[in-house]
Regions:
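Short, compositionally biased low-complexity segments enriched in polar/charged residues
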Residues: 60-114
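Hydrophobic single-pass membrane-targeting/anchoring helices
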Residues: 1-41
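Extracellularly exposed regions in secreted/surface proteins, prominently low-complexity, repeat-rich
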Residues: 146-239
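Extracytoplasmic/secreted envelope proteins and their assembly/folding machinery
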Residues: 88, 92, 130-134, 213, ...
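Mid-length scaffold segments of soluble, non-membrane domains
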Residues: 99-147
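Short extracytoplasmic
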Residues: 30-61
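Localized chelating/binding microdomains
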Residues: 4, 27-30, 63-65, 73, ...
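Extracytoplasmic/periplasmic, Sec-exported soluble proteins
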Residues: 83, 92-95, 108-111, 121-125, ...
Length: 239
């Protein structure tokens, strides 16, 4: 706490002699909130970052005109890794340039048991670095509209599950989203190891995969980057 306060411009003398300001300035509040968001990848339980289940809506339209909602189930969580360990070689340098701190991964299966998706949370020191990395990833993948697997997160196999044989060679579609100091990557493949279907000949399958990946990665990114309550007092019980 002392280090954090002094970094915000509160002197050691003020802290030790009870002369701390009664309220944070707006700039100090914003900095504290940014620190809290950037620390979540370290402080939150893995099961909170990667929920056991979550819902998404595939492109299917029901007879009554409504949309279908399916549940994605988490198969397992991989060990924390570096960018070099958890991402493709072609993106490691651009992620490291932004100060990649770690990659957290989990693998899910979709509601029909057809698709596997590995989600990778890449943590950066701040939102500016994450945004720059996301822009570089988008340029590298041609905007994400490609029949090829865009470079990104590597598949995370989960022993004893339907994803025990999920490897990089089985990846079909990859993309990413960015929120706050995080870039959330995902990659999807078939659960039964069938051959890749070119997107230009099966656009519906591509839409199914991206609705799954976009929905899951966006929910994880939103939770990690949600704004915390505004702090008011530096260590005091009330202002």
């Amino acid at each position: 706490m002392l280090i954090g306060l002094t970094a915000l411009g509160v002197s050691v003398y003020e802290v030790n002699n009870g002369l701390m300001p009664r309220k944070f300035t707006q700039a100090q509040q914003q900095q504290i909130m940014a620190w809290e968001v950037a620390a979540r990848w370290r402080e939150l339980p893995a099961g909170t970052i990667f929920p056991a289940t979550t819902t998404y809506s595939p492109p299917t339209v029901l007879e009554d005109g409504g949309s279908l909602t399916l549940t994605t189930r988490r198969l397992g969580i991989a060990r924390q890794a570096t960018c070099q360990q958890a991402t493709d070689p072609s993106v490691v340098s651009l992620l490291d340039r932004g100060g990649c701190e770690a990659v957290l991964r989990a693998t899910y299966v979709d509601g029909t048991g057809t698709f596997l998706v590995t989600v990778g949370v890449v943590a950066f020191p701040g939102a500016a670095q994450a945004s720059a990395a996301q822009q570089a990833l988008s340029r590298l993948s041609g905007g994400g509209q490609s029949n090829l697997v865009a470079p990104g997160v590597r598949a995370a196999a989960i022993t004893g599950t339907a994803a025990s044989g999920f490897t990089d060679t089985r990846r079909q579609v990859s993309s990413s989203v960015s929120e706050g100091p995080y870039v959330v990557l995902y990659t999807i493949g078939y659960a039964d190891n069938r051959p890749k279907v070119p997107v230009d000949t099966d656009g519906y399958t591509y839409a199914e995969m991206t609705s799954l990946g976009d929905g899951l990665s966006s929910k994880i990114a939103d939770k990690l980057s949600a704004q915390p309550p505004v702090p008011h007092c530096p260590g005091a019980s009330g202002c």
